[in-house]
């Protein structure tokens, strides 16, 4: 995440939006603050939405909705999701409270952007739950992109 932000920080042709643990208390500690909005031509194209301790599915989905609105307004031709499932409530490095079902709902919300979507799996350290959590997000993408399909 922080490396991705750095790559695009001065560009206006790529929008970077990130939901992640608050860097005041969570890795990487040095970047990802809400006031980091881009520089030079990229001013305003960078959005960090740090998550408070204990962020649950409802709070996460609310912020993801804000992110999706910003993405839709930007008008991209593709969305790239850096999927970190270290937001999971049992993840050993997490102080968040996202559930497996919440990850499915996140996928559904992202799919509603109705854009070609690339998903890159990044964080996640509860080795017993990573597969279920990634599968849940992908199921959400699948269901969300086909409104006639029932989960």
Sequence positions of predicted segments:
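A general "terminal functional-core" signal
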Residues: 1-151
